[in-house]
């Protein structure tokens, strides 16, 4: 008989599906509940209720209560052996307290102290896995079964493919103000390079003028990129930029692994994780804008080889979601 897993997490870049697929299908049966932090269950009705509401805070409160009722109803009907919660920022404490017949796991894919609702779940978990290594010791005071666990990549999606490398510089991700400033400076410094930035920022119903203007922008592309599309873009790029959120201290983002999984060349801002785990590999890191600009200048002047088979082999062997799921199951 297969072990039943109920996986609950935010709908973001298909991470829930990637984690679910990492469970061995011969041994595990996985049911997924995707959610949105503003309107709970992902369906058209909830979106209408939220966006048409005159008081969105109240609407969100009601929709998240509805989500928690749905989670408990699913739990009671499905009767999982393991509840695997990713982030869990919208899951109520009382919801977890009623999950008495299962092993309950929390995995954070960003800093837990930026998610106060997630912190409230810590003492109710059988094990907690954290994005930030610096968060482990403080959280251990509440739950001794707390471990550092970085993200990973889905090796069924991110892989090397044979396509023409027609993009010089590529960035995919959320455009915070600091990132926009850096990318604009980068384009101004290297105007002859083919630079592409993908991020869904504007919707017609919210900002019609900015949306229409974005249709004519050939650099900042107003588009959500699926994981499959991201893999193609990484393979097309000569240089993939990776900039971590300012909140990241030690933790490394999933794109670090996804770009390497596509066997693409990555220029990434320096993080201690890279020193600790990849010191004997040629990871291209920078600490300042000046260093990044010089790296790009040298790359497009000398055009050194991009493929690194040894690095790709390391990533594929140790940093897939299958590796992470196996580690989690060992701990619980």
Where are the language model's segments positioned?
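Nucleotide-sugar donor-binding catalytic core of glycosyltransferases
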Residues: 2-53, 64-70, 86-90, 95, ...
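An amphipathic, basic-hydrophobic alpha-helix
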Residues: 58-80
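Catalytic alpha-helical scaffold of carbohydrate-active enzymes acting on polysaccharides/glycoconjugates
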Residues: 72-76, 96-98, 114
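Active-site proximal beta-strand in glycosyltransferases
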Residues: 82-87, 97-111
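Conserved acidic donor-binding segment of nucleotide-sugar-dependent glycosyltransferases
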Residues: 282-289, 298-302
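A charged, aromatic-enriched C-terminal amphipathic alpha-helix characteristic of glycosyltransferases
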Residues: 300-332
């Amino acid at each position: 008989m297969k072990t039943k897993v109920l996986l609950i997490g935010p709908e973001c870049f298909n991470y829930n599906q990637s984690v679910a697929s990492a469970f061995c299908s011969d041994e595990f049966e996985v049911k997924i509940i995707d959610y949105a932090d503003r309107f709970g269950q992902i369906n058209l009705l909830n979106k209408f209720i939220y966006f048409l509401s005159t008081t969105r805070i109240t609407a969100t409160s009601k929709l998240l209560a509805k989500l928690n009722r749905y989670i408990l109803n699913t739990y009671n009907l499905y009767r999982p052996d393991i509840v695997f919660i990713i982030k869990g920022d919208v899951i109520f404490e009382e919801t977890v307290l009623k999950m008495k017949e299962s092993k309950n796991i929390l995995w954070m894919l960003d800093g837990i102290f930026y998610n106060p609702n997630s912190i409230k779940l810590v003492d109710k978990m059988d094990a907690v896995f954290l994005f930030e290594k610096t968060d482990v010791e403080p959280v251990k005071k509440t739950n001794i079964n707390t471990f550092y666990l970085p993200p990973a990549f889905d090796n069924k999606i991110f892989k090397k493919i044979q396509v023409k490398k027609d993009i010089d510089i590529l960035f995919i991700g959320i455009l915070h103000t600091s990132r926009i400033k850096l990318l604009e400076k980068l384009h101004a410094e290297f105007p002859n390079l083919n630079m592409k930035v993908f991020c869904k920022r504007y919707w017609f119903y919210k900002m019609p003028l900015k949306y229409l203007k974005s249709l004519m922008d050939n650099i900042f592309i107003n588009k959500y990129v699926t994981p499959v599309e991201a893999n193609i873009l990484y393979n097309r790029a000569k240089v993939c930029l990776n900039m971590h959120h300012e909140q990241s201290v030690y933790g490394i983002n999933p794109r670090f692994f996804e770009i390497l999984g596509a066997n693409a060349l990555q220029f990434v801002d320096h993080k201690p994780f890279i020193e600790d785990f990849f010191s004997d590999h040629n990871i291209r890191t920078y600490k300042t804008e000046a260093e990044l600009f010089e790296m790009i200048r040298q790359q497009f002047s000398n055009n050194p080889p991009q493929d690194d088979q040894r690095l790709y082999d390391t990533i594929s062997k140790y940093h897939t979601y299958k590796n992470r799921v196996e580690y989690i199951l060992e701990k619980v």
